[in-house]
A protein has these predicted regions:
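Bacterial N-terminal signal peptides that target proteins for export
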Residues: 1-7
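N-terminal signal peptide c-region/cleavage motif recognized by signal peptidases
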Residues: 17-19
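Hydrophobic small-molecule pocket/channel-lining residues, especially in calycin-type beta-barrels
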Residues: 22-168
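Bacterial N-terminal signal peptides
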Residues: 8-15
Length: 168
């Protein structure tokens, strides 16, 4: 009888611990709320190796407020024309990860999974290949940075660095 009581107590403890951890896991809405500061228009500066430039990006709630739509507009540089890009990002509670995917007017496309810890989103690229990562850091409600990805360019490895400020 004593052994059966111990087994039942162990099972009950495991169930209570499991339900407690499920309750502390952020909900989809909690996760989406953490990114609400992004909604609006941003002016960004970026460097990639020896290159530096500016661009604008805008975030808007879409698809029933379950997704954020991000648009980029990069001006023409050198021989390259302007580039427009559209991305969607949201939190998927089924896999406990953020997802982000989109395409550019120059035929580039990317897909990513991400995790958020406080004000930091760590993204891993999954399309077109599984290499590369980027870290988004919320500095304030009107400023964030992006560091990464790193990749080879003109015989050396470069890392992208972006600093964005929200417009008024």
């Amino acid at each position: 009888m004593h052994r059966a009581s111990l087994v039942l107590a162990a099972i009950a403890t495991a169930l209570v611990a499991r339900s407690g951890s499920a309750q502390t896991r952020p909900t989809r809405m909690d996760q989406l709320q953490s990114a609400e500061f992004l909604v609006g228009s941003w002016s960004c500066k970026h460097t990639v190796g020896d290159f530096s430039g500016t661009y604008t990006t805008t975030y808007a709630s879409t698809l029933g407020d379950r997704w954020l739509k991000q648009t980029y507009d990069f001006p023409a540089t050198g021989e390259d024309g302007p580039v427009h890009a559209e991305y969607f990002l949201s939190y998927d509670g089924r896999i406990d990860r953020w997802v982000r995917f989109g395409a550019h007017s120059n035929a580039q496309y990317y897909g990513m999974f991400g995790k958020r810890a406080d004000n930091v989103w760590s993204w891993s690229y999954v399309l077109p290949g599984t290499s590369g990562s980027a870290v988004w850091t919320k500095k304030s409600d009107v400023e964030y940075t992006v560091d990464g990805p790193s990749y080879p360019q003109n015989g050396k490895v470069v890392t992208e660095h972006h600093a964005c400020r929200k417009g008024s």
